[in-house]
Amino acid sequence: LEVKALGVMQTGALKEGEIAKFGTLVEDRVYAVNHQHFFCARLDMTVDGEKNQVVETESVADPIGETNPYGNAFYTKTTVFKTEQEAQRRHKYETVRTWTIQNPNNKNRMGANPGYRIQPMEVVSPFFQEGSVIHRRAGFLLNHLWVTPYNEKEYFPAGQYPNQNPGPDGLPKWTEQNRNIENEDIVVWYCFGHHHVPRLEDWPMMPAAKLGFMLKPSGFFDTSPCLDLPPAKCDPCCE
């Protein structure tokens, strides 16, 4: 999934001699405002069947010793989320944390569960303060990952009417129930965004900034699905 942010940036006016504390000076006494873009993808997953679960994978450096004499080996540890509150998670650079939606009822040719892994493009954390309006109304941004059991009434991560609702609502409210999400019909909510400190090159019309994520098969296919593609032709493109 790819989203492109572009257009004319929001600007503010400065007094004579005033410093642009919250943005970048792009014209005389005009600054473009620092800001962030956020999106929440609602992924109603059906990986090889209706009953799914989410697994977290983290990489761990093995201490230098008999199994790691050169100090460069690492292994992975996995955790299966059982309830909604266990699945309220954030990215962690130190362990290259990833999440995979799996079907625990099926196996691939190596005996592992087939799945699809969320592969981020840009990881962003919100800069709003606790107690602010956006903190109350858009609390879903506090985590990169949420997982809920399927409910047709739970469609918008901030709730039905965020502009008229003082909050909290949506995902923070729904997940207070702490429902079971292991081997269930689940919905995965993934929050991603773009942190934009404006450049002069973004003015007056900014080029597209790409953001998003990928769903990459992880044990879903028994081998590389590219192996049986027809060979490329060397025909000339024109005559």
Regions found by a protein language model. Give the residues of each.
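Extended effector regions of multi-domain proteins
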Residues: 2-17, 21-239
